């Protein structure tokens, strides 16, 4: 991994392209992306025009917005996270991980505070870093499991997808425990980080991504075993019970390579993307409605002003019925402001 200094990022910020458009205080969409060899944060408005870009030192992954700031985290394992000005894309602060740890790719904000997942370099035990609006560390507390990935917040606390993978930061894509992986959904208290609940997933099923709404919490997973033996990849937490949700008719874990890439709520429906199967699902857990839609390399999903947006590694982004073709290769996730 690369060592990143504040000076390096200040130089990078001078290379950023900043452009404002009349009538828009903040961009509509923020996403990590790639253009040639460059890794960027891309800020778009509703019709796909670029408002600004920010040059990153490596591949970015998760983002969050709060008031006038945006936070971006590098893809795991990462030794950097950044606070950017949401309107202009200018760099405000660099956040290093705690000593002996790396960031695991996701961040969530609540009022003036933000929470980043991180893990120990040895053993991958999970922690949550609590920071203020300028990147100052408020606290660090256990995540309740190994390898925390996506975090979401509601009035019950911080929900954490502890993926269960033990890795080495020098060999990040080698899972050291592929046959003994233990993943869980945990909930910690926002104020003091006290662990409230831990709900286990089936062995070797890695919980990766979460979405929360008044209809409950949805979780998307990746299976580490033989695809033909995969348990359900999509789960629904209703109250205190975690329930599996089957895929649409004609879809199997084999057809999506046992991997769901992102998840979101759209009204009463759960949207789950399967980039390796070139498809996304619309599922209503209350009525058992389930339907598959095809889209090449679709992964990012968000809801903006009540409308569903998706993005792909092929450079497509927008509402499914009005996708815009761009010059960027979008990463797995984006946020709709």
Q: What do these predicted regions represent?
A:
Residues 1-17:
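N-terminal secretory signal peptides and thylakoid transit peptides that target proteins
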Residues 36-41, 79-82, 123-127, 170, ...:
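Structural motif
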Residues 43, 127-133, 178-190, 232-239:
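Beta-propeller blade signature
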Residues 49-54, 90-97, 136-141, 194-200, ...:
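A short beta-strand motif characteristic of beta-propeller blades
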Residues 54-109, 117-118:
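Blade-loop segments of beta-propeller domains
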Residues 58-65, 102-108, 146-152, 205-210, ...:
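Repeated scaffold domains used in trafficking and secretory/extracellular systems
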Residues 98-108, 117-153:
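Asp-box/WD-like beta-propeller blade repeats and closely related beta-sheet repeat scaffolds
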Residues 117-122, 161-181, 221-231:
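Short, conserved, GDST-rich strand-edge loop motifs in beta-rich repeat architectures
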């Amino acid at each position: 991994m690369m060592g990143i200094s504040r000076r390096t990022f200040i130089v990078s910020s001078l290379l950023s392209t900043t452009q404002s458009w009349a009538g828009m205080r903040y961009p509509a969409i923020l996403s990590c992306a790639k253009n040639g060899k460059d890794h960027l944060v891309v800020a778009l408005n509703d019709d796909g025009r670029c408002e600004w870009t920010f040059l990153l030192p490596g591949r970015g992954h998760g983002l969050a917005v709060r008031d006038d700031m945006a936070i971006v985290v590098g893809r795991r394992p990462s030794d950097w996270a950044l606070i950017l000005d949401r309107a202009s894309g200018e760099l405000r602060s660099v956040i290093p991980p705690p000593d002996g740890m790396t960031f695991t790719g996701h961040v969530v904000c609540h009022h003036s505070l933000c929470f980043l997942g991180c893990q120990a370099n040895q053993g991958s035990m999970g922690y949550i870093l609590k920071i203020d609006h300028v990147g100052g560390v408020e606290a660090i507390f256990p995540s309740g499991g190994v390898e925390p990935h996506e975090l979401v917040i509601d009035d019950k606390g911080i929900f954490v997808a502890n993926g269960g993978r033990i890795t080495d930061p020098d060999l990040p894509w080698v899972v050291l425990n592929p046959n003994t992986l233990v993943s869980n959904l945990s909930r910690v208290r926002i104020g003091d980080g006290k662990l409230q609940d831990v709900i286990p997933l089936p062995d070797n099923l890695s919980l990766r991504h979460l979405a929360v709404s008044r209809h409950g919490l949805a979780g998307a997973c990746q299976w580490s075993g033989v695809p033909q033996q995969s348990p359900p990849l999509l789960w629904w937490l209703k109250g205190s019970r975690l329930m599996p949700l089957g895929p649409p008719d004609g879809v199997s874990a084999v057809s999506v390579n046992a991997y769901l890439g992102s998840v979101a709520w759209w009204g009463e429906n759960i949207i789950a993307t399967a980039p390796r199967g070139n498809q996304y699902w619309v599922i209503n857990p209350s009525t058992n409605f389930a339907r598959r839609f095809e889209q090449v390399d679709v992964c990012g999903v968000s809801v903006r002003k009540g409308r569903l947006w998706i993005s792909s590694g092929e450079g497509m982004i927008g509402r499914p019925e009005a996708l815009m073709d761009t010059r960027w290769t979008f990463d797995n996730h984006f946020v709709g402001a």
